[in-house]
């Protein structure tokens, strides 16, 4: 019988039993990682005490990679190899960017399926750029927490489509992260506010980040977070305010085309001016371009507001639609939660306050609130806290359907459907003798397929030849908790079936991702061996401490040979701790455990006798 071991409260005897989880806000401008410690969520700082990590990656000549502040500082001088705002590019194509590529200081490839960025280290995709940011946050979390993360919750804009969500998960895979859940950013903010403040009622989350805008209408009741409606624009954010000020600067100085270095220089300066106008009434932009031209332009807060007021008003249209979808009037909204660094702009706050007739909530840092909510959710999903205390009901932001005859889009799952969910609908053949059917999966609100986003196609074969309209094909759509889609089609009379897990053709196929994982995980085997040994060492030390403590108390229960055998086994185990392999250490642990079985039984009998001494039968 092995010695019974009870660890001290709050202590974990083995690293594999200690479940470390984190929430990650993968942002356009800045990214953060947070975790729950001692019952409360907190963002984790870097070595310099900064919790925000600039979402900037630089590729160096020597093959190295810089991420964060050091990369940001080189953006002006090395724009072609320094990538920022990758979140605006992830899961998108060149066609999605429309006319906005001209002010982005990158060399885009001509691939039509996904975006390519040419750097000195070769072609990079937004997925790979995002993976470097996630790797840095992973390292920060694991160094701070002193162990490996079992999983993370990564936040995404509520209006991210299937391609953008899948691309985000692929970036996490490249970074070596286990994604417990993709969580909509407004929902994460609601979790942070709801749990911190025990709020109840109807709330609106207004989330204006660096590259995206989301709005969600939520009903918060005790223990329930229900998203009633969501909306937004995944291509509207603080970057657009920068772009408008950038264009104004060009107009004022009669400039047209700039090289990449000058473009990056002016973009960084207008971004700084925008931030300055948050607290000051005037900002001055001064620069010398590569051709020697001097720029010296002042702009007042009022001028900046006039230049960008149309962008602010553009955010209110999805707000109105979300309220309409939720069946909620402005006067029924108990509070408006402001999320995202761009909500610091005074005219944004004023517009929201005027629209709702109330001062928005800002008692949590708008830069941190999303990461905090993600950390709380990660803590639950990792099993560190029972999720019976609260229930999260999220929704899908866009309708999902398929193409029917005539290029029409038939909606299967309407937008604002609570997820996870599954819906089925029956379809039939169009021609006599038709034996196959192509299922074209689309996403969007428009009636025509040409106006919706194509997600995937697959073919159901083996349909029995019948008259047109006689066959019955049941198509089932399933959305998981991450908002990712799978579709199946089954002919009802024969049971023949086809299905697909929708992986949009934004770029990286499984083989490519697998190869990237192999390239980035060259030391994975060594890492696993080291972890296995560390776990074995912890187990060995725990057993040795327990045996030594027992010997101090009850060694008189052993005869000389038993005592000597236990001592020899302890010495053997300690000797293997120095340089033994995991399997050698575990073998020695098993041997010591066997040699102490009889000792453990004798100790238990003694303790039972002590407990019963002086007790009558009636008291037992």
UniProtKB/Swiss-Prot annotation:
The organism's place on the tree of life at top rank: Bacteria
GO terms (molecular function) for this protein are: ATP binding; ATP hydrolysis activity; ATP-dependent protein folding chaperone; unfolded protein binding
Q: Which Pfam families match?
A: HSP70
One GO BP on record is:
iron-sulfur cluster assembly
Spell out the SUPFAM superfamilies in the cross-references: Actin-like ATPase domain, Heat shock protein 70kD (HSP70), C-terminal subdomain, Heat shock protein 70kD (HSP70), peptide-binding domain
Against InterPro entries, the record matches this protein to: ATPase_NBD (IPR043129), Heat_shock_70_CS (IPR018181), HscA_NBD (IPR042039), HSP70_C_sf (IPR029048), HSP70_peptide-bd_sf (IPR029047), Hsp_70_fam (IPR013126), ISC_FeS_clus_asmbl_HscA (IPR010236)
What UniProt keywords apply to this chain's record, in alphabetical order? ATP-binding, Chaperone, Nucleotide-binding
> Where would one find the signal peptide in this protein?
none
| General function of this protein | Chaperone involved in the maturation of iron-sulfur cluster-containing proteins. Has a low intrinsic ATPase activity which is markedly stimulated by HscB.
User: Which family, according to UniProt?
Assistant: Belongs to the heat shock protein 70 family.
The molecule here is called Chaperone protein HscA homolog
**Which organism is this protein's natural source?**
Neisseria gonorrhoeae (strain ATCC 700825 / FA 1090)
